[in-house]
Regions:
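Rossmann-fold NAD(P)-binding glycine/threonine-rich loop
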Residues: 1-39
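Charged, low-complexity surface patches
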Residues: 2, 66, 121-123
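Short coil/turn connectors at secondary-structure junctions
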Residues: 15-18, 42-48, 153-154
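General beta-strand structural signal in soluble alpha/beta enzymes
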Residues: 20-24, 47-50, 142
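Conserved anion/nucleotide-ligand pocket segment
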Residues: 37-98, 103
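Substrate-binding/catalytic subdomain of NAD(P)-dependent oxidoreductase enzymes
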Residues: 74-171
Length: 172
C-alpha cells in the first residue's frame, strides 16, 4: 500500500493535519525511514542496497548453514511464524520490491511502480547453487538495490546475489 499509494496517503495526512508514519512498512523493527529522512537528510544518496525481507533471508540462511532444501526451509519458516500461509509475495521477491521502491522514493525522489521494477525471487535457488556459491567464497542473499546514475536517472531491482562472505550483508 505504501509503495503504490504512499504519495496519496501523505497528501491526505497533511490535509487532515496528522502524521503519516510508515516506518514499519520497510524493515519492520529495524529503523531505516527515520534515519534517512532526519539524520541523513543533508546527505545525497547514490545507492541503496540491502536485505529487505526476513522470510527469504531465513530460508536462505537455513539452506546455507544447515543444508536444508528450499521447500523444507520454507515449511520451517511457516511453522515458526516467519512466513505467511501464502508466502508468494516474499519468496517471489515482491515484498522486497515494494520496499526498495519506498526507499528509492525517499532517497532519490523517484517513484518506481513495483510492477515495473525487475524482480526475481528465491524459488529457483537450489542447494547446488548454495554449494557453488560457497566454493566461490560467497553466500546467496536476496538483495534489493536502487541506484542513482550520473545522468540523474535511477533504476531499481530485486534479485538473488552472490555476496562475498567477508561482506557485512553475508552475516545478516
Amino acid at each position: 500500500l505504501v509503495a503504490t499509494k504512499g504519495e496519496e496517503l501523505l497528501r491526505i495526512a497533511k490535509e487532515k493535519n496528522v502524521n503519516y508514519l510508515f516506518e514499519a512498512s520497510v524493515g519492520g523493527g529495524i529503523p531505516i525511514i527515520r534515519p534517512m529522512v532526519q539524520c541523513l537528510a543533508a546527505n545525497e544518496f547514490n545507492q541503496i542496497c540491502g536485505i529487505l525481507n526476513g522470510t527469504t533471508n531465513y530460508i536462505l540462511t537455513q539452506m546455507i548453514k544447515n543444508g536444508v532444501a528450499f521447500e523444507d526451509a520454507l515449511r520451517q519458516a511457516q511453522v515458526n511464524g516467519y512466513a505467511e500461509a501464502d508466502p508468494t509475495a516474499d519468496i517471489e521477491g515482491h515484498d522486497a520490491c515494494r520496499k526498495i521502491c519506498i526507499l528509492s522514493d525517499l532517497a532519490f525522489g523517484d517513484k518506481f511502480d513495483p510492477d515495473e521494477v525487475s524482480c526475481e525471487g528465491i524459488t529457483k535457488i537450489t542447494l547446488r547453487d548454495v554449494e557453488c556459491a560457497d566454493k566461490l567464497g560467497c553466500v546467496i542473499k536476496l538483495i534489493g538495490r536502487a541506484v542513482r546514475c550520473e545522468d540523474g536517472s535511477a533504476y531499481a531491482f530485486v534479485a538473488p546475489h552472490l555476496v562475498q562472505k567477508e561482506s557485512p550483508l553475508a552475516a545478516v
